[in-house]
């Protein structure tokens, strides 16, 4: 394993941590509607749980309402139940074969709670990135110990890994700040 291999491995794993954070932040509800909020809601379809997006067409009616159009009419009831029973705090309204999902306005207290959750997600991502940095630095030290690379190469490798870490942490901070601003916007 070379310095470049260690650097590339650290970079790809850090990028996966950022992707995970992005997914986790997208699940946190703001006051605005977006179809992605229903991505992890599962509905029973012929005996097996499937995401709502696979059994219905999801559209945004306006900034605060999602329209759910089931592909099969008999699925309207189960979809409505699945959305209501999810942990999102949504109250769908059935209009015949279409379901409207209005996004309730967030209270100030709920907004503060959500910003704490966002900060916590960001901190978890930073810890993951720092752990990856530590693993990369340990791998570099092992290469020096095994006399595969020189100490100068190790130092250069550590500098590169540190730059990757700094960039990842800056990206995490930016994502967290954007999400907090989105939540606090009334």
Swiss-Prot record:
For whether the record's keyword set contains Ribonucleoprotein, the answer is: no
Say where the protein is mainly found. Answer: cytoplasm
SUPFAM superfamilies for this protein: Ribosome recycling factor, RRF
- Keyword Cytoplasm: yes or no? yes
Q: Which UniProt keywords apply?
A: Cytoplasm, Protein biosynthesis
Compartments annotated for it: namely: Cytoplasm
Q: Which domain of life is it from?
A: Bacteria
Q: Which Pfam families does the UniProt entry name for this protein?
A: RRF
GO cellular component annotations, sorted alphabetically? cytosol
Q: Name one molecular function that GO assigns to this entry.
A: ribosomal large subunit binding
Which protein family is it in? Answer: Belongs to the RRF family.
What name does this protein carry? Ribosome-recycling factor
The gene designation is: frr
């Amino acid at each position: 394993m070379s310095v470049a291999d260690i650097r590339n491995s650290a970079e790809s794993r850090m990028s996966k941590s950022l992707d995970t954070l992005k997914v986790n932040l997208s699940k946190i509800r703001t006051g605005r509607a977006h179809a992605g909020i229903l991505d992890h809601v599962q509905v029973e379809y012929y005996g097996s749980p499937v995401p709502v997006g696979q059994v219905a067409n999801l559209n945004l009616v306006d900034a605060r309402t999602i329209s759910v159009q089931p592909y099969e009419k008999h699925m309207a009831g189960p979809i409505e139940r699945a959305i209501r029973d999810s942990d999102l705090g949504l109250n769908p309204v059935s209009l015949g074969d279409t379901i409207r999902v209005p996004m309730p306005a967030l209270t100030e207290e709920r907004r503060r709670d959500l910003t704490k959750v966002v900060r916590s997600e960001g901190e978890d991502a930073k810890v993951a990135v720092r752990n990856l940095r530590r693993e990369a630095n340990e791998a570099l030290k092992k290469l020096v110990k095994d006399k595969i690379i020189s100490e100068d190469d190790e130092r250069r490798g550590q500098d590169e890994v540190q730059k990757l870490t700094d960039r990842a942490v800056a990206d995490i901070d930016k994502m967290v700040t954007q999400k907090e601003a989105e939540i606090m916007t009334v």
